[in-house]
Amino acid sequence: KFVVEGEEEVGSGHFDDYVAHHADDLAADVCVWEGGSKNEQEHFTVTGGVKGILAFDLSVRTADVDLHSSLGAYVDNAAWRLIDALHSLRTPERRLAVDGYYDLVEPMSAGTRAAVDRMDFDAGGLRERAGLRQPFLRDDPKLASVSEPSLTVNGFESGYTGDGVKTVIPREAHAKLDCRLAQGQTPQACFDLIRAQLDRNGFSDVEMTFQLGEDPFRSNLDDPYF
């Protein structure tokens, strides 16, 4: 049996309904998701799981209009306000500073950890190809790539970014973010934890809008089919 699905890049919004309506036709002992990808060593890869994702927006408004920067000594700035909110969610060690966030992560089994240890992983090659200018965030990037949650700022927009100079205090700021979720975490639970943390940190004025969520999945690497 083959299933071809073309909405993966936009969240597979119709896939669950399709599977539910065709459950009898799709019944099977095991499913293989064929990707055909190769790693840096030109080896075909077998993926035993994927992280989940939570995508959301943050927005803040500090005034009804942009103001002249001569008022900057005493008038707050939406860009700084959102930067401060983002900074409050990260520790100096570059981990998420969100109460309860890591408590949801399920421990890795011995079999899965052994499989990770056997993985081909070329961290140096990635550094060279991407031209990375900062150290890796973790001493073991291979393990982090499969087991550790992350929070990524995808984009930030505020104020004037055109040519030349425009001395304004922006009235609003917006950021797009995503979290890669480890096994045991769910998009809604993590969204709620981040919202609660922002409120505790004094940023209840920062609006948070859910965009997309998918649960993580990990195959049982001890299963005979694997």
Regions found by a protein language model. Give the residues of each.
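Acidic/histidine-rich catalytic neighborhood of metal-dependent amide-processing enzymes
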Residues: 1-49
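Metal-dependent amide/peptide-bond hydrolase catalytic core
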Residues: 38-41, 55-226
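Short, flexible loop/turn motifs enriched in small residues
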Residues: 50-54
